[in-house]
Amino acid sequence: MESNHVKMISGGKCMNNNEINAAWFINKYHCNPESIKVVMINEAVPEDVKDDFYVPDSSYSQSIIGLFSNAGILCDMQELLEKGIYVCNAVKTPKEQSAIPLVQIKDSLDELEAELALFDNLKVIMLMGDVARKAFNMIAKKQTGKNVIPSGSTYKLRHNEYYYHDIRVMLSYICTGGNLLIEKSKVTMISEDIQLMLSIIGDCHE
């Protein structure tokens, strides 16, 4: 993951890249990365930054809040952070077509890898869709020499247990977009996956 190259900041204090990234995370989300137990990796950032996860009343945030509500958890995005659940996107640039090309996924890998490196206490990584699966498999293969999730349909694989080191890796479906309004079965399956994730981290329904 991102190197520990040391940088100087004001006051002469030395900080490595992970410390700088952690300070950025705390400043942006008002949450210590050490408290994060779950990362949900979605597909790609929205075309408009105002639609992203941590913008109040955005389309992305409403999708997540609705899915957690279906799973029995009534909360907003900040409350999810307080529970130790962080949501991000695998691809850091908006998609320009329905299928995201591999080169675009690869262009965001370093940033995603550095993002995941912030969280020392992860228990679960949820891969929300095929793009997240591809991106995470590439990171895992770089680190360990092999994929975490094998080839196959999400429907057939989502009930299997996979691990990256000692972190449970769960395969699910994209958690944003208009398809959620149409494909009610996927909403049900995502909510089931969220319930399983909550049971793994020991969170109870409210």
Roles of regions detected by a PLM:
Residues M1-S69, Y163, L196-E206:
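Active-site and ligand/interface coordination hotspots across diverse enzymes
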Residues E2-A23, P94-E113, L118, M138, ...:
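C-terminal capping/extension of enzyme domains
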Residues H30, M77-E79, H159-E161:
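Short secondary-structure boundary/capping segments
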Residues D51-D52, A135-I139:
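A short acidic (Asp/Glu
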Residues Y54-Q104:
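Short, surface-exposed acidic-centric catalytic microdomains
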Residues V131-R133:
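Alpha-helix capping/helix-boundary segments
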